[in-house]
């Protein structure tokens, strides 16, 4: 019932109503949040780094079953540029390594 009464109001009006109904101590607690704990701030760079590494290796996880499946011939599993050692690589333009 309360939801039906409040649903025509905009989110800004609902926020103003909520702040009006709360006691002043709760409002100041909502507006002035304490800073995060120092241990969490130290852990944040490691979380960001692990997320970036996961995104970097994500394509490898999807192609790993295809690369390891024995039903495909080796020419399909490994492109030609992977099958040659760097000093025996066939001559090709440098832009070919970008694709």
From Swiss-Prot:
Disulfide bonds: none annotated. The keyword Transcription does not apply. The keyword Membrane applies. Changing residue 74 to L: In strain: Isolate LAF. One of its GO terms (molecular function) is SH3 domain binding. Pfam families: p12I (PF12233). Keywords: Evasion of host immunity by viral interleukin-like protein, Host endoplasmic reticulum, Host Golgi apparatus, Host membrane, Host-virus interaction, Inhibition of host adaptive immune response by virus, Inhibition of host MHC class I molecule presentation by virus, Isopeptide bond, Membrane, SH3-binding, Transmembrane, Transmembrane helix, Ubl conjugation, Viral immunoevasion. Signal peptide: none annotated. There is a cross-link at residue 88 (Glycyl lysine isopeptide (Lys-Gly) (interchain with G-Cter in ubiquitin)). Ubiquitinated; a fraction of P12I is degraded via the ubiquitin system. One of its GO terms (biological process) is symbiont-mediated suppression of host antigen processing and presentation of peptide antigen via MHC class I. GO terms for cellular component: host cell endoplasmic reticulum membrane; host cell Golgi apparatus; membrane. A motif (SH3-binding) lies at residues 4-11, 33-38, 70-77, 88-93. The chain crosses the membrane at residues 3-23, 48-68. Lys-88 seems to be associated with tropical spastic paraparesis/HTLV-1-associated myelopathy (TSP/HAM). p12I is a modulator of T-lymphocyte proliferation and immune function and may contribute to establish a persistent infection. Binds and down-modulates cell surface expression of interleukin-2 receptors IL2RB and IL2RG. Also down-modulates cell surface MHC-I molecules by binding to free immature MHC-I heavy chains in the ER and targeting them to the proteasome for degradation. Binding to IL2RB mediates recruitment of JAK1 and JAK3. As a result of this interaction, p12I increases DNA-binding and transcriptional activity of STAT5. Belongs to the HTLV-1 accessory protein p12I family. p12I is a homodimer. Interacts with human CANX, CALR, ATP6V0C, IL2RB, IL2RG. Binds to MHC-I heavy chains HLA-A2, HLA-B7 and HLA-Cw4. This is Accessory protein p12I. It comes from Human T-cell leukemia virus 1 (strain Japan ATK-1 subtype A). The lineage of its organism: Viruses, Riboviria, Pararnavirae, Artverviricota, Revtraviricetes.
